From Swiss-Prot:
GO BP annotation list: endoplasmic reticulum to Golgi vesicle-mediated transport; intra-Golgi vesicle-mediated transport; intracellular protein transport
The entry's keywords: Cytoplasm, Cytoplasmic vesicle, ER-Golgi transport, Golgi apparatus, Membrane, Protein transport, Repeat, Transport
Subunit structure of this chain's protein: Oligomeric complex that consists of at least the alpha, beta, beta', gamma, delta, epsilon and zeta subunits.
Protein name: Coatomer subunit beta
Recorded GO CC terms: COPI vesicle coat; Golgi membrane
Organism: Trypanosoma brucei brucei
Length: 982
């Protein structure tokens, strides 16, 4: 069957009950009551739509049904005239159809406005000139009818008639222009406006100018305003030099009361103008919608729009940061998270104080919020706030003094919030020497109450690294001793009870009650000591035990904390003896030295005793022994030089490769620059860098693509057109690269396909060319998708002329991001009605088509790495020798992004990274991150080293929250490795 034959069947309507013959229908139409005649008309319409022509019933309908005044009958009659064939095989109008003109004229001038409206809507669908011509005057008369329903449909009828037969209504534009200037109904005005837009744009421009002068644009109806916005955007794209005429119109419509109109108007301004005023107005409109609208989906869409604006107009949005953050007061948890994430990207010198104040307010809200059911979401939001505070402090250092007292109270918590806070404090101590003294004092005050082992470890390292004065060093030593008192160290009550239970269980006896010594007064007044069973619970006993903070962590069996404790004590004692010996009494230094030795000996004894909660590892044991040795001989010049050089090395590392370690979005290289703005886009940074020997381009004397790009850079009016042209060319080239040939030119049919992946479906564009000199009929594609893909609908059947071609598009639903295969073949019918088949190559849908590079901070990466269970490890053994080249090869092959970018400027760091420098670095470890279109995460860790032969080997580990993602990435990595070998 040819494709043209299917064009006549628009839809199929099911018939219920027994089939009806023509005699019964004719009898019902002639002699039945209103209900019977209506049922007969409905049956006629259904039968004709389903492929049973009913032209032989036209005269019966004209004679017996058309004169009736029943409204429902009138409606069905018009439906019948719409679907019935009104022309013969040669295309001439049937003689019977001339008879309905008088009835249509009566309906167009009927006293009842409903019937008039039905007739006018029918006139919109008539395509026969002979029927339309005698009714034009009747249609035009309805433009001045008193009822808006009639006028609304009359404008539509005039529009359709003028579009099909402009010679029948040459003054249609003038009539509609007069109509729209006098019309008060919004829908009728909108229909008239759409007609003028299509038929006479100049009159639309005149109409808009009159509206702009009368200042009535903001008071128009929402539907008409939406049409005006679409027209303005279309005209500006067609002729950018008239932009000023329409931007003022859009500014007026921005004051509309309808949120949909305001959103569309703001989006149009963003797409057609780069003026700061227009962008600022669009941003303020989005922010106002974010504040006033209650629908969650709409607010999320607006936040996404603002985030898209940030990539191009970051500096303009920075001025509106206060308005954006005000949405936090009445937002849901998801809205709050997105607003904070957006606000972090907009922090600058001018607005960082506003941002920090908003974060303070939100932290207080999180602390006092008890009614939230989703505690996990609240915890994630708290971590996000603290991470945002870190970013703000890194970009506005002088705000740290106000922020640190606020976040210090979160050091006490055992979740990840404490680690985020101590990371912030670490950066402040390293980058802002003026705040070290006060910050270290606050740390010393809070050390006793910290319970998280990782936080305690970092705090100890900070105290050992940044405490330099003699008084502070002595105070820290006393603090550490007091924190671990009372001595000697003993296991916690919980550990003692556990050991007792294990011992009693091993003996098989019943557990003895806990005994307590008490004093009893006898009858003669004497005092005696007696042991009685204790009724205290385990919790009470633990509450009385000194197991808080550092002591509790150490006695609880986490012996790794002893290593940073020993390192801190040794650093403090070495500094005390080498740099402050002249200002401190010898007895005081000796006392501090003895106290440190005594404390470490006690820690070492406790960690190696038989009743300890666990076993100390060899590395920690060795570090404690080494610290004792260093404290015993603290005046060694080697130790003093080592401590000082380690501090200098830390400063040097921060200055050189701070940008590499800035996975959380910090730029340490710019910490002293007063012009630091928030994290700008990569394009902006590239524009700022310009070599002194770059040639100057003169637009007037250049040709080709270079001149176009220069015009794009300096000419604001042509930027939209130039960008659109370049983007379309790039999209075409990308699509061309994805096109895969599936058959050869020697086959009767040549076929090629390109796959486009969307979020939940796949679109395959097929190109089929007839390589023969014969007409091939019934050409169709048979598809068999494998995997999670399902075919939405069967492809249509086509007829291809000799050496002709056809394009077919098919859609497949996708359930999960995994590699799939589409098996296909092309069936056709030759000139002698013989059936043929061309088996095509398989179309592979790679999992990488679903993957997009994404951003992720280092802390988020660690959290996800610990949380996700699905892991796939791929061993590496390659002939490549360049580490950076291999990392980039993996990154491009897996569509991932490095968490920590390469250093580009420092040759020493680069050579260290590549392992070609004198320092002999021969290994690389880096993390990569990506997200699928389904929202699934993919985390990669690449660890490689260079062996003695110069070849690279190592491991790539993949973790994901879904099994298909981890499996697919592992398969892709194996393919990449095989390509290198081959």
């Amino acid at each position: 069957m040819e494709a043209k034959a299917e064009g006549f069947c628009s839809f199929l309507v099911g018939l219920s009950g027994a089939p009806v013959n023509s005699k019964e229908l004719k009898s019902a139409l002639e002699k039945g009551d209103m209900k019977a005649r209506a049922s007969a008309l409905e049956a006629l319409i259904r039968m004709h739509l389903n492929g049973e022509p009913q032209n032989h019933m036209i005269m019966t309908v004209i004679k017996f049904i058309t004169p009736l005044d029943d409204h429902y009958i009138k409606k069905l009659v018009l439906y019948f005239w719409e679907v019935v064939d009104k022309t013969d095989a040669s295309g001439k109008l049937l003689s019977e159809m001339i008879l309905i003109c008088s009835f249509l004229r009566e309906d167009l001038l009927h006293p009842n406005e409903y019937i008039r409206g039905l007739a006018l809507r029918f006139m919109c669908k008539v395509k026969e000139r002979e029927l339309v011509e005698p009714l034009v005057s009747s249609v035009v008369q309805n433009l001045t009818h008193r009822v808006t329903y009639v006028r609304r449909n009359a404008v539509l009828a005039v529009h359709r008639i003028f579009k099909r037969f402009p010679e029948l209504l040459p003054d249609a534009a003038e009539l509609v222009e007069k109509f729209i200037s006098e019309e008060n109904d919004v829908s009728a005005s909108r229909n008239a406006f759409e007609m003028l837009v299509e038929c006479s744009p100049d009159r639309v421009v005149k109409f808009l100018a009159e509206l702009r002068e009368s200042k009535n644009l903001e008071s128009l109806g929402a539907t008409l305003q939406m049409s005006i916005v679409d027209f303005a955007g279309h005209m500006i794209r067609a002729n950018p030099y008239d932009k000023g005429r329409y931007v003022t119109v859009l500014f007026s419509i921005l004051q509309s009361n309808n949120p949909a109109v305001r959103y569309q108007c703001a989006s149009t301004l963003l797409s057609i103008s780069t003026s700061p005023t227009a962008i600022r107005q669009a941003a303020l409109t989005f922010i106002d919608l974010l504040k006033t609208h209650t629908d969650i989906s709409v607010r999320l869409i607006v936040v996404d729009q603002l985030d898209a604006m940030r990539e191009r107009f970051s500096k303009i949005l920075q001025d509106s940061l206060l308005d954006i953050l005000s949405v936090l007061a009445n937002g849901t948890m998801e809205i709050r998270k997105r607003i904070v994430t957006l606000g972090v990207e907009l922090v600058s010198n001018q607005n960082s104080e506003v941002f920090v104040q908003a974060i303070k307010k939100e932290l207080y809200w999180v602390k006092n919020e008890c009614d939230v059911d989703d505690k996990e979401s609240l915890l994630e939001y708290k971590k996000l706030l603290i991470r945002a505070t870190r970013t703000a402090v890194a970009r506005r250092p002088h705000m740290a003094s106000a922020v640190i007292p606020l976040v210090l109270e979160y050091l006490y918590e055992e979740d990840d919030s404490g680690f985020e806070v101590v990371s912030l404090i670490r950066e402040v101590l390293q980058l802002q020497p003026s705040l070290r003294s006060e910050t270290l004092r606050q740390l010393r005050q809070t050390l006793r109450m910290i319970r998280c082992p990782s936080v305690i470890r970092t705090v100890l390292w900070l105290l050992g690294t940044h405490v330099t004065s003699a008084d502070d060093a002595l105070e820290v030593i006393r603090l550490l001793i007091n924190t671990l008192e009372p001595l000697p160290l003993e296991p916690t009550v919980k550990e003692q009870m556990k050991q007792q239970e294990d011992f009693d269980g091993h003996k098989g006896g019943q557990q003895k009650p806990r005994m307590q010594m008490t004093t009893i007064v006898q009858e003669d007044g004497t005092y005696v000591m007696s042991s009685v069973p204790s009724n205290k619970t385990q919790e009470d006993a633990e509450g009385n035990d000194s197991n808080c903070g550092l002591r509790g962590v150490l006695t609880g069996g986490k012996f790794f904390i002893a290593a940073p404790l020993a390192s801190t004590l040794s650093k403090l004692i070495i500094r005390l003896f080498n740099h402050h010996s002249s200002g401190v009494d010898e007895s005081t230094m000796k006392e501090a030295q003895n106290s440190a030795i005594m404390l470490l000996n006690e820690v070492l004894r406790f960690c190696t005793m038989d009743g300890a909660a666990g076993m100390i590892d060899d590395a920690t044991h060795e570090q404690i022994r080494l610290a004792l040795l260093n404290i015993t001989n603290p005046r060694s010049p080697l130790l003093a030089t080592f401590v000082e050089d380690s501090s200098k090395a830390l400063d040097s590392l921060t200055n050189k490769v701070g940008s590499i370690a800035g996975g959380d979005g910090f730029d340490f290289n710019k910490r002293n620059n007063d012009n630091v703005v928030g994290r700008t886009s990569f394009d902006e940074q590239q524009v700022a860098l310009c070599s002194v020997d770059t040639p100057v381009m003169f637009t007037q004397i250049m040709e080709g693509k270079g001149s176009l790009l220069e015009l794009e850079a300096v000419d604001d009016l042509g930027s939209v057109v130039a960008n659109a042209s370049i983007e379309k060319t790039e999209e075409f080239l990308i699509k061309l690269e994805k096109t895969v040939p599936l058959s050869g030119f020697c086959d009767p049919l040549y076929c090629e396909a390109s796959v486009t992946v969307h979020q939940f479906d796949i679109t395959v564009d097929w190109y089929i060319a007839n390589c023969t000199a014969n007409v091939l009929r019934d050409v169709s594609i048979e598809l068999t998708p494998l995997g999670s893909m399902k075919l939405c609908e069967r492809p249509q059947v086509h007829t291809i002329q000799p050496h002709g071609s056809v394009r077919i598009r098919t859609a497949l639903k996708v359930g999960s991001p995994e590699t799939g295969v589409i098996c296909a073949s092309v069936l056709y019918e030759g000139p002698q009605n013989e059936r043929g088949c061309v088996v095509l190559n398989n179309v592979r849908v790679d999992i990488m088509n679903y993957v997009r590079p994404a951003k992720c901070s280092a802390s988020e990466f660690r959290d996800k790495w610990c949380k996700y269970d699905w892991e796939n490890a791929v061993a590496i053994r390659t002939e490549k020798t360049d580490m950076r080249e291999y990392v980039e090869y993996v990154m491009q092959g897996t569509n991932t992004r490095l968490l920590e970018p390469y250093p580009e400027e420092d040759d020493e760091v680069v050579s260290a990274f590549d392992g070609k420098g004198d320092n002999g670095h021969r290994y690389v470890s880096c993390n990569m991150y990506a997200r699928t279109l389904f929202g699934d995460d993919a985390l990669l860790n690449v660890s490689i080293e260079r062996d003695a032969e110069g070849k690279l080997s190592g491991m790539v580990r993949v973790r994901a929250n879904k099994r298909p993602v981890a499996y697919g990435f592992g398969e892709k990595l194996n393919i990449l490795n095989r390509r290198i070998v081959s």
